[in-house]
Amino acid sequence: METFQCLTLFLLFISTVFILKRKFSHKPNLPPSPPKLPILGNFHQLGTLVHRAVTVLAAKYGPLMLLHFGKTPVLIVSSQETAKEIMKTHDLALANRPLTTAARALLYDCTDISFAPYGEYWREMKKMAVLNLLSIKKIQSFRSVREELASDMIKEITRLSKTGAPVDVTNMLYHFSEDLLFRCTLGFKPKGQHKFQKLSRDFLDLVGAFCFNDFFPGMAWMDALTGLNRKLKKGSRELDDFVDELIEERIAMVKDGVEPNEFLDLLLHTHRDTTQEIKLTRDNVKAIILDTFLGGIDLPASVMEWAMAELMRNPSKMKIAQEEVRKVVGNKNKVDEDDVYQMNFLKSAVKETLRLHPPAPLLFARESYTSINVENYIIPPYTSVMINIWHIQRDPKLWDKAEEFIPERFMNSGIDYKSHDYEFIPFGSGRRGCPGMSFGVAAVEFAVANLLYWFDWKFVGDTTPETLDMTEDYCFALFKKKPLHFIPISRSS
C-alpha cells in the first residue's frame, strides 16, 4: 500500500512538471512553413525546377518561409527587403556554405573558394584569385585574349555559314568561354581540354543530385544502393586526373622556358613556398583551379546563350542591339573592347538577360552558424538559407511588365550589378557574392557583340520567335534545356 502511494505521488509529480513545462516553455517563433510529411519534410513539394516550386509556395506562405528537407531546415527568402536584411545585416552570420557530401568528394574536402568554410584560408584564397585573375586590372589585361578567341569563333561560324546549315550556337559559345578561362588561368589550352565539357556537366549533376547522407544521415547506406557513391568516386577520380594532367603540362612548359606568370603558376609557387603562412597542398591547388573552371566556364556560357535566345525571341530588341553595335564599330575589321563600353543597349540587354535568367536562381546556399533574428522570426543555427532572386527579379511590385524582355528598363536607370536596393542581384552580395562577376560580364558582352556585328541570324525550319523553346534545365545552376541552333548570314556575304 505504501509503495502504491509513493508511486502515485511520483507520477503526479512527473505529470505536474510535464504540464508546467508545456505551459511555460517558450517555443522559438519560426517562419511560416507548408505542411510537411513525416521524415521527408517538404521534399515532395519541390519538383525538378526548384526555383519555380518555392516561388509558388512563397505566394501562399510568405516571403520568409521555412522548409524542411529531411533533417535540414531550409529558409527561402523571396522578397527584396528580406534579402537585403539577410545579406547586409546578417552577412557574417551567414558566411558559411552547407558542406554537402558531393562538394566534399569533388572539391577536395571543400578547399576551393566557392564552398570553403569562412575563415583565414577562404579569405586568403579569395584575395589571391581576385588580385591575380578577377580584378578589373587583370580583366583588362586579358583583352587581347578575348579579342583573339572571339575572332577564332567568328571565323569558324563564317566557315560554317557558307553551307547555309544551322550552327550550334550553344556549343560555339561554350567553347569560347572554355578557351577564354583556360587561357586566362593557365596561359594555354590543355591537351585534354575536350574532356572538360562532359566533366563539368557531370559535376553539376552530382552536386545537384539527391544525397541521403545530407538529409537523412541514418540512411546514408542508401547512397551506395542508388549508385551515388560510385558516381562520386568516379567523378572525383576523373576530375582529379584532368587537373593533374594540366598541372604537369604547365610544369613541363615552365621547365622549357615559358614565363611562369599565370594564375596556376602563382598557386604552384605558393604550394612550394614553405615560408607562406597559409600552406597550400597540391590538392588545395587543384581545388581552386577546378573551382575557377567550373564557375567561370559554364555559367557565362549559359548567360550568352540566354541572351541570344531572348534577342531572337524579340526581333525589335535584336534590331536595336544590332544597329547600335554596327554603328559603334563602323567599318572596322573587328570589334574591340573600347567599342563595347559605348554599347549601352547591349549592356542593358545583358542585364535584362541576367534579370530573367540568373545562372543561380536561388543563389548558392548559405548556412547560419548561430541563431539570427529576421523580421522577428528566429532562424536556428545550421539552417540553409536560399535567396530566391529568380522571383525577386521578376516581382511585379518591383518591375513593370516583369515577365517581358525589356532592356530599356536598365537604360539610364542607375541599377548596376551591385544594387544597393537588392532588386537586382544576379551575382549575390556580401562576403559570398560572386568574385568573378566582372570577368564573366566582360566575356558575355564581348561575345554577344561579336555575334550581332558579324552576322544576321535566322530561325531553323518553321521555328518562330513565339515557338522558340525556352524550357529551363536546373541542375545546381540554371541552363537552357535545348541547345540553340540558328542559321548565320555573314555580313561579308
Swiss-Prot record:
EC number: 1.14.14.131
Cofactor: heme
Catalysis: reaction(s): (-)-bursehernin + reduced [NADPH--hemoprotein reductase] + O2 = (-)-5'-demethylyatein + oxidized [NADPH--hemoprotein reductase] + H2O + H(+)
GO MF annotation: an example: iron ion binding
Entry keyword DNA damage: no
Keyword RNA-binding: no
Binding site for heme: 434
Topology in membrane: Single-pass membrane protein
A Pfam family this chain is assigned to: p450
GO biological process, one term: response to wounding
Practical application: Combinatorially expression of Sinopodophyllum hexandrum (mayapple) genes of the podophyllotoxin pathway (e.g. DIR, PLR, SDH, CYP719A23, OMT3, CYP71CU1, OMT1, 2-ODD, CYP71BE54 and CYP82D61) in Nicotiana benthamiana (tobacco) results in the production of the chemotherapeutic compound etoposide.
Residue spans crossing the bilayer: 1-21
Xref: SUPFAM superfamilies: Cytochrome P450
Highest taxon in the source lineage: Eukaryota
Main enzyme class: oxidoreductase
Induction record: Transiently induced after wounding.
Gene Ontology CC terms: membrane
Keywords annotated in UniProt: Heme, Iron, Membrane, Metal-binding, Monooxygenase, Oxidoreductase, Transmembrane, Transmembrane helix
Annotated localization: Membrane
InterPro entries the UniProt entry points to: Cyt_P450, Cyt_P450_CS, Cyt_P450_E_grp-I, Cyt_P450_sf
Matching PROSITE patterns: CYTOCHROME_P450
Role summary: Cytochrome P450 involved in the biosynthesis of etoposide, a chemotherapeutic compound of the topoisomerase inhibitor family. Catalyzes the conversion of bursehernin to demethylyatein.
Name the UniProt record assigns to this protein: Desmethylyatein synthase
Source organism of the structure: Sinopodophyllum hexandrum
